[in-house]
Amino acid sequence: RSIHQEELPEEPKPTEADESFDDFIYNFASDDALQRQRVKFPLPYYKGDEKTNIEERNWKHDDLFTKQHYYTLLFDKEEDMDLVGDTSLTSVQVEWIFVKTRMVKKYYFERIKGAWILEAINLRPVERNENEDFVEFFSHFAADSLFQSRRVQEPLAFVTSDPDDDFSILETSLDLNQWFAFKPALPTDRLSNINYGQRNDDNSPTKILALKGIGNGFSNILYFRRKAGEWQLYKFEDTSI
């Protein structure tokens, strides 16, 4: 081997966790040594139109959402939820949507020779348009129970695991009081999202917010649709284990 070749840093070797992006991202967020191996330094950091580079010595470990009990995912339609376990993906973005400041922080991951690598971070404002914006709506919905009660369809479709049979699903409905009794704690300051390739169109008439437990069996899905220009919760699914 020539001297020149030996100076090149070794390429990260893929591990078993790289097969599924969800497994990888959990390891990436919880293991500092792995994280440093999987960030492409100097890392381009875009803030609006400004670009800076983060050098390895200035990198601070990023827990992403692993310090929370759950994370959230956003979809426009149900069939896109099948992308979650897809092992053929090569490009995924992890997003933080900061509800109050209306900013989105996006982490760009690429799978290179089997190993997931963070290639860039981008911070930008949420785009505004004429329709009631889902992020803005959700910030009210999560924080204000009076507003929430006006935006829950009655009766609310409810899907849950059958308490007598783990493998079957019960489909029933809830009234408003039952929704308030069964609903999960909703995030008020920021939403996470993993973009596996699903569309997230601001003009979509439907939105799905999935809440997924980290290291526990929690799983809730909220289904929203725009009715006469206003967002409304029309279906709630609780299949927690």
State where each predicted segment sits.
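Sec-dependent signal peptide cleavage junction
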Residues: R1-Y46
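Solvent-exposed, acidic/flexible segments
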Residues: P14-F21, F98, R102, E127-F134
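A structural feature that tracks compact, well-ordered secondary-structure segments
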Residues: F24, P42-P44, Y107-Y108, F137-H140, ...
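Short loop/beta submotifs within extracellular cysteine-rich repeat domains
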Residues: A33-Q37, W116-I117, Q148-R151, W231-L233
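Acidic helix-start/capping segments at beta-turn-to-alpha-helix junctions
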Residues: F41-K51, P155-D164
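Surface-exposed, charged secondary-structure patches
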Residues: Y45-M103, D166-F218
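Short beta-strand edge/turn micro-motifs at domain boundaries
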Residues: V99-N129, G217-I241
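Surface-exposed beta-loop interaction hotspot
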Residues: A115-R151, P155-L170
